[in-house]
Design a protein with these regions (language model features):
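N-terminal secretory signal peptides that target proteins for export/translocation
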Residues: 1-19
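Mature N-terminal segment immediately following signal peptide/propeptide cleavage
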Residues: 39-68, 83-85, 140
Length: 839
């Protein structure tokens, strides 16, 4: 057993003799002071802690919280009641009276005795749950635990194995029977009830456990059903980040398990830099310091620097794959190249096993905000009920803080920008909240001032408050950011002309679009995911050097359920090995100007390649079963009677927000933005040979090989999702009913490609009028030479044309009236003459 083995190894290292213990007990305090400057050991603030047996070895360890914090006082008080003056056993268990035998002190390996990783979801009802019971209760319905959306996505890519249903999760879980068990306000609960009625396949009642991957003795089944490889792919690659495992131990991926995944700091290098001399400083996989990070009140000291909040890099430990929102937020774009070279002349060090180029950072990141400053407790911990996709579990929208040009955030109706419908939300003003939610009172409580802003779904935004007509965002890192709402900025005329036109002049933009459709400066776009799952086994494939296998992260999580492994701090040494080796490649990368489409909320959104697998599967005998195969979803799905190609273009919030929005032309004059793809590639479903050839393309040598094999069915580029007739040719999202590509009608409405021709087909001399004006402008020096001058000219032409047409329209009734008056005056004398003659 892993824990017992570690205990034996550490016992030999740390307990070579009882005399050694006496030396350690006398010298640890001075030693720790030199090893961890700035991070105070517990004994400094609680001298009585020295009486705990734990301190005989761990005297230099940092305070888990600030000594004056309510949490630290509660820990120490409870520790005294339990007979531990240092309070260690409150979270870790063990025997604080034992000072000679580590095995006894650590209480063995069973979860009922000792918790080396107190945050682990497998035992945290006994640790974190003592004070944070509601958070512990809801962790099992968190999307970070179930990963149901990710699982459904891979199943979709392998031929829509479950259709739109989010059937499977890492672990079996179901909703509470009482609707009032959902954490949040009554308004929020009612709102979520309505969403469940709209999207029952996403807001599900229960998840079944993910099916097992093929065992070594089952590989013969692949030839009959290659889709079984999907479960190997999911379990080896996709699920290593979920909440119930410590995950991959690579640079950038080091983290805790369960609550500790977020609330314990780990550096990218994974080394411990605190004051506990018993922790090996040469080994990776350790926390940076033994202190909890969380809200503004939770101060963490590392060497001589004190910070608060959860750093973005903690979140990026997991959020560096898939939509890559974590690294994108930081301004990092994945690249296949290892440049620029490191200081020693070697390659750029791998981070999350990848390499990066520096891009523009999200403006919120630039302002010092972290993920938790926008994302609420319900977003990350769960509200206790299942939501099987990101868009389902996140309750916030841009307008919640920024409002619109004509309404403050508190004047907006609930559900604005979160409609899950094709029209904007309507209704009465949402107002503000006067108090926080009950289950978040242990965090930092900010002065409500004129009220806490409400999220789109009706919960208080507990760090964002109204102050008159302004908004204050209290960041976990300690900043109080005062922001002007859009309504204020428009009133003060502080919005650029482009912004005024886009947000104030074109109503449909805010009625139908996500703010980030324009304000995302870039999006990582990895076109074509070439997945190979190689099941070659040496006994079936004599020329193979080894039998290929990998680590099953879901099985590792379930192994934690076993009594002897509930308290394990990680998965090292686990035997959860399954056959198959997964490798991934891409066709090409882009970042600029993402295409647009419709998301599940019914709004225009950026799209990026989601899961676009071209699947290659190698059987146990080393022979290919599938090569470059793209599955199709079931007939009838995604607006296709035959079944759409399952290469998905996913609606995304890129987390690359900037004040400067993308240009009008980047949408209205772009085929890519409309979903028509990137021009320039040849058909991917053709084999491409590169060798000596004749002018009519006959290959001259007899001995040649294809440079690029054909990819079956892919008769268009990876970036195309719809054709010019509005026929969708690939899937666009696979979670929600409304996600799709633009229709033909929408394409025509959006596209302004070729607008230049409207003027220039008549210029300079195609008609007498334009020829005359062009020559006058040319010889008087008025021809526009810059974009600004051109815009001014077009503006003048538009105004002149408009006034001229208005004048004509106004002149017509005036002429009619004048003509009538003239006619009446003309015929009146005739009538008068007739009357005189008759007299």
């Amino acid at each position: 057993m892993f824990t017992a083995a570690v205990s034996r190894i550490n016992a030999r290292v740390l307990f070579p003799s009882r005399g050694y213990l006496r030396v350690v007990a006398l010298s640890l305090l001075s030693l720790s002071a030199s090893m961890s400057r700035g991070a105070d050991p517990i004994i400094k603030h609680f001298p009585e802690a020295a009486n705990s047996g734990c301190m005989k070895c761990h005297a230099g360890i940092e305070l888990i919280r600030d000594p004056n914090s309510p949490m630290m006082r509660q820990i120490m008080d409870r520790g005294r009641l339990l007979g531990d003056s240092a309070g260690c056993i409150v979270c870790h268990g063990g025997d604080p009276k034992e000072t000679k035998d580590k095995t006894i002190a650590h209480g063995g390996a069973h979860a009922t005795d000792f918790y080396p990783a107190p945050g682990s979801p497998w035992i945290n009802q006994h640790t974190c749950g003592q004070c944070h019971q509601k958070h512990v209760d809801v962790q099992w319905t968190s999307l970070m635990m179930t990963e149901a959306g990710k699982i459904q996505g891979v199943c979709w890519a392998f031929g829509s194995l479950t259709g739109y249903q989010h059937r499977w999760a890492n672990y079996a879980v179901k909703n509470p029977s009482d609707p009032k068990a959902r954490l949040g306000t009554d308004i929020y609960r009612d709102y979520m009830r309505r969403l469940k009625q709209i999207e029952p396949d996403v807001f599900v009642d229960a998840h079944e456990p993910l099916p097992e991957a093929l065992r070594f003795d089952e590989l013969h089944r692949l030839k009959e059903d290659p889709t079984l490889a999907a479960f190997t792919y999911i379990r080896q690659e996709c699920q290593r980040c979920h909440h119930a495992v410590k995950g991959r131990q690579k640079r950038g991926d080091f983290r805790g398990i369960g609550c500790s995944s977020c609330h314990t700091p780990y550096s990218n290098e994974g080394f411990y830099e605190g004051g506990d001399p018993t922790i090996n400083r040469e080994a990776t996989g350790h926390m940076l310091v033994h202190t909890i990070q969380g809200t503004r009140d939770a101060k963490v000291t590392v060497h001589e620097t004190t910070y608060s909040g959860i750093p973005v890099e903690t979140c990026t430990t997991c959020h560096d794959r898939g939509k890559r929102i974590g690294v994108s937020f930081q301004g990092l774009m994945e690249t296949p190249y290892h440049s620029p070279y490191a200081a020693d002349g070697g390659p750029q060090p791998a981070l999350h096993t990848k390499h990066y180029i520096a891009m523009e950072q999200d403006i919120h990141y630039q302002k010092g905000m972290t993920c938790q400053d926008c994302h609420t407790s319900n977003d990350v911990h769960s509200d206790g009920f299942l939501a099987a996709a990101n868009l389902a579990s996140v309750q916030i929208e841009c307008a919640d803080c920024h409002g619109t040009p004509d309404r403050y955030p508190w004047e907006l109706p609930l559900g604005f920008m979160d409609e899950f419908a094709m029209k904007p939300a309507s209704g009465s003003a949402r107002g503000v909240a006067t108090r926080q939610l009950d289950h978040t009172h242990q965090g930092t409580i900010y002065d409500a001032r004129d009220g806490y802003l409400l999220t789109a779904r009706g919960n208080p935004y507990e760090n964002v408050v109204r102050d008159g007509d302004e908004v204050i965002v209290h960041t976990a890192a300690g900043k109080d950011l005062r922001i002007k709402t859009l309504k204020q900025l428009f009133a003060e005329k502080k919005v650029s002309q482009e912004g005024t036109v886009a947000m104030g002049g074109v109503a449909k933009h805010l009625d139908r679009m996500e703010c980030y459709a324009c304000h995302s400066s870039w999006t990582p776009q990895c076109y074509g995911c070439h997945v190979k799952v190689d099941f070659s086994q040496k006994h079936k494939c004599p020329e193979c050097l080894e039998s290929l296998k990998g680590f099953d992260w879901v099985a590792a999580g379930r192994k934690h359920e076993e009594k002897d492994h509930r308290a394990d701090r990680g998965e090292e040494g686990y035997d959860t090995i399954i056959p198959g080796k997964v490798t991934e490649q891409r066709s090409y990368l882009r970042w600029e100007e993402p295409m647009l489409g419709i998301n599940g909320e019914g709004r225009v959104t950026p799209l990026a390649p989601g899961c676009q697998p071209s699947v290659t599967i190698i059987g146990e005998d080393g022979e290919p079963i599938l090569v470059n195969h793209i599955y199709k979803v079931d007939p009838g799905l995604e607006r296709s009677e035959e079944g759409q190609l399952s290469i998905d273009m996913s609606p995304t919030q890129p987390h690359t927000t900037t004040k400067q929005a993308r240009s009008c032309e980047s949408c209205h004059a772009s085929k890519k933005a409309l979903g028509l793809g990137i021009d320039g590639t040849r058909p991917w479903n053709e084999e491409h040979v590169v060798d000596l050839e004749t002018a009519d393309k006959q290959i001259l040598p007899k001995q040649y090989q294809p440079q690029m094999e054909a990819i079956e069915n892919l008769d268009h580029d990876w970036s195309r999702i719809v054709d010019e007739q509005g026929n969708q040719v690939a899937t666009v999202g696979h979670h929600f009913q409304l996600s799709r590509a633009f229709t033909r009608e929408e394409q025509l409405h959006i596209s302004r490609e070729g607008t230049c021709l409207a003027c220039h087909k008549e210029l300079p001399n195609q008609s007498l009028a334009t020829s005359f004006l062009h020559h006058v402008a040319k010889y008087t020096g008025q021809l526009p030479k810059t974009n600004i001058e051109h815009d001014q000219l077009v503006h003048k032409v538009v105004l002149m044309s408009a006034w001229l047409q208005l004048g004509i329209v106004a002149l017509i009734p005036m002429l009619a009236i004048g003509g009538a008056i003239y006619h009446r005056r003309r015929i009146r004398p005739l009538f008068e003459g007739d009357r005189e003659g008759s007299t």
